[in-house]
Amino acid sequence: LYLRYLSKRESRELLEKLKKDFKLVQEFDHIIVSETVLKDKKIKIYIGVSSTEKIPLAIDLVEEFIPAIHALNKDLMKINYVKIDQGALPRILNGADVMAPGIVETSDFKINDLVGVREFERSLYIALEKLS
């Protein structure tokens, strides 16, 4: 595990990418990157630091850059979503794919979009899925 602060330029570039890709709505004083290796792949977790809190913002999986679910649930970013009913919730939490019968609401999205899976009652994100 390796932690470091991003330079001002690196932080600015990352925040611009998050604003463009995921509609980030909050500024941060600093960005920390945590680097680790998981199953022979280098993973980076970007953490936003403000005067009051530290929030995981995004995860760089080398082939894919995704928002952190915690940041989505704090409404710091916006992505397309599907809401699922309570009957589908345990299956999704155990790794099942999202199927049409469990979907009760959707936003506009296209094939190959990254879509957040939200539970219907509290509207919290529980998973991310790439549509194919």
Report each predicted region and the residues it spans.
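Accessory RNA 3′-end/elbow-binding domains used by RNA modification enzymes
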Residues: 1-132
